[in-house]
């Protein structure tokens, strides 16, 4: 079975796009007004809201305003993607990527003009660069050495960051911008004793945003009301994972199309998979239930089924 997607130049719902732009401008306005104060701004987004684009453009605006900015995310892959996105939108902006000592700058970043890999101390002495690092590296490299003279700390994927990491890095700047997908799974730990703290007022596995809002309930929270990734047929399902957050698809109904073409007859095993794919192509989503059975935490049968579904698609 092969797939053909139509509608790459999809028509947009201009009212939805305008509403999202207005929310993002309000976030930037709040952030600039609060810069330098002990304050924060939160941006809550559904999947596919363009939050990384918003973050990259916003740090460019902050630097253009003369503010020293530290940009962080939980994982190495995320911060490397942020470096690329920042350079795409701000090609002339110097970027200091603070990585592990003795590790070379990844090839796809080394080829970017204006991206350096200084030590934390060197990055601190430089006046121009935007500093980008993981939350852990930012806390270790700067606060351990008494550094961290930034005006604004920006954290992308903030709902994936746990409170413990946020506590360690929060001191690098007085003003924070936390942006993330509220539908993500909460932070977790593989340690058996991690549940000792669960439910406590200072649970280290709370989200960074959760602990911020509990301690500072007056923090402005802006909900980005758009998803560029989903079309209108899938949005009602996605909204179930975002209670209290209203958002709509940026593309108009029927602006996208998925046509599936079968190479030949399927089998009894493939029949439910084909039916689910046909339903998803027609309706924008599908729900497929496996036969009930007692399973372990790791369910190999489900993993095999997902693999077969992806292979068939």
List each model region and its residues:
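Conserved helicase motor core of SF1/SF2 NTP-dependent helicases
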Residues: 40, 44-49, 61-67, 73-81, ...
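Hydrophobic positions on the alpha1 helix immediately C-terminal to the Walker A/P-loop
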Residues: 54, 58
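Short, compositionally biased "basic patch" segments
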Residues: 1-40, 264-289
């Amino acid at each position: 079975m092969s797939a053909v997607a139509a509608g790459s130049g999809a028509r947009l719902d201009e009212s939805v796009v305008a509403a999202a732009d207005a929310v993002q401008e309000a976030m930037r306005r709040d952030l600039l007004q609060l810069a330098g104060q002990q304050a924060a701004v939160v941006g809550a987004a559904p999947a596919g809201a363009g939050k990384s684009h918003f973050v990259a453009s916003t740090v460019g605006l902050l630097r253009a305003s003369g503010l020293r900015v530290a940009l962080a995310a939980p994982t190495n892959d995320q911060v490397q993607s942020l470096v690329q996105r920042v350079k795409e939108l701000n090609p002339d902006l110097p970027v200091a990527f603070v990585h592990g000592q003795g590790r070379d700058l990844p090839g796809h970043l080394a080829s970017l003009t204006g991206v350096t890999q200084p030590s934390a101390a060197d990055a601190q002495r430089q006046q121009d660069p935007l500093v980008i690092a993981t939350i852990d590296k930012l806390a270790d490299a700067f606060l351990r050495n008494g550094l961290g003279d930034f005006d604004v700390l920006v954290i992308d994927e903030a709902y994936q960051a746990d409170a413990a990491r946020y506590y360690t890095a929060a001191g690098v700047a007085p003003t924070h911008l936390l942006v993330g997908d509220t539908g993500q799974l909460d932070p977790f730990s593989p340690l058996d004793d991690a549940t000792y703290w669960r439910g406590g007022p200072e649970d280290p596995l709370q989200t960074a945003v959760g602990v911020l809002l509990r301690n500072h309930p007056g923090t402005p929270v802006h909900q980005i009301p758009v998803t560029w990734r989903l079309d209108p047929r899938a949005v009602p399902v996605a909204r179930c994972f975002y209670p209290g957050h209203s958002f709509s698809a940026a593309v108009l109904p029927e602006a996208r199309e998925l046509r599936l073409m079968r190479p030949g007859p399927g089998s009894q095993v493939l029949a439910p998979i084909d039916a689910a794919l046909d339903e998803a192509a027609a309706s924008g989503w599908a729900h497929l239930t496996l036969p009930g059975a007692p399973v372990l935490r790791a369910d190999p049968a489900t993993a095999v089924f997902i693999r077969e579904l992806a292979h068939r698609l």
